[in-house]
Amino acid sequence: MNSNVQLFIRSAALLAINLLFLMVWGFAGISKVMDGVPSWFDGKFGKTFLASFPGLTATFWLLTISELLAFALAGVALVRIEFLRQRPAVFLCATLAWSLFVFLQLGFGQWLTSDFNGGFQQFMYFTGTLVALHVAQSVGRPAQAN
């Protein structure tokens, strides 16, 4: 395949992954900051141990901070223009690795409350993130001159 086409595909794949995770964590984290703890949160998690430790408010804000950190990492990757040939995708890979832990947090809450459909969805997000991380690590290295 033509090396210019390969570089375009690499850049497009990394940019799309970067923008997707920037969007996912940006909307999730910023909406939590803007709206605060939702009214349903106590009803869903109030009967779990999370109500005692670390507490529902702390649980909500720890999740929010986790999402905002993923958003910030994705933002740094985009600002560094890691999707271009000259840059290794260090912050993009960090975004994806951290996202695995955020999806783990989200999935834990779903499984804890016996929301098995939600838990399965988080499992699929986790799996998709693993695929994205593999792609970013595989194509995320700068192209070598021949």
Where are the regions that the model predicts?
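Extended, low-polarity transmembrane helix blocks
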Residues: 1-31, 60-65, 69-146
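Membrane-interface interhelical connector segments
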Residues: 33-55
